[in-house]
Amino acid sequence: MPQKPARCYTKRRSKAFSGPPYTRKEYIHGVPPPKIQKFVMGNPHGDYDYIVEVYVTERGQIRHNALEAARVAVHKYLSTTIGDQNYFFRVRVYPHHVLRENKMMAFAGADRLQEGMRQAFGKPVGTAARVYPGQAVLEVRVKKEHLDHAKEALRRGASKLPLPSRIRVIPLKEEAKAAA
């Protein structure tokens, strides 16, 4: 069954979501597991010069399959261009928030079978990560010679995310800070 668009889970007002996140999985039956396979990739023990990260500029929810699509795009580009031992990549958010959907029937005579908005709590259909402005979603650590490849990889990954995002470069060493 196809997924509903993001507008079904967001408000039109300035607030992207209201209320606390719906996360208590011990009380929720049938929550599908997140599609994200790995949160940490590459070489975590390398000596890197820069952190390049994607951060969001608006408040909102990022579904688990959007995070997985961004992860796959970034990891594939980095592993083919600079190799697995030359970067450290991490997904910084976890999809804790459970999304629910009150499924409606869409065929002739459905109005006699379903209850409409009566008891419209909904069944769990997926999970999402709630993010706030300035919060980093994806992070790559690289050496100076691979900085442009990291920016391009994160640009490709950011295009998979449903929120407007930007890329920032943070130098880790003093000589990199002086050059920046």
From Swiss-Prot:
Keywords: Ribonucleoprotein, Ribosomal protein. GO terms for molecular function: structural constituent of ribosome. One of its GO terms (cellular component) is ribonucleoprotein complex. Pfam families: Ribosomal_L16 (PF00252). GO terms for biological process: translation. Gene3D superfamilies: Ribosomal protein L10e/L16. SUPFAM superfamilies: Ribosomal protein L16p/L10e. The keyword Ribosomal protein applies. Belongs to the universal ribosomal protein uL16 family. NCBIfam families: PRK04199.1-1, PRK04199.1-4. This is Large ribosomal subunit protein uL16. The gene is rpl10e.
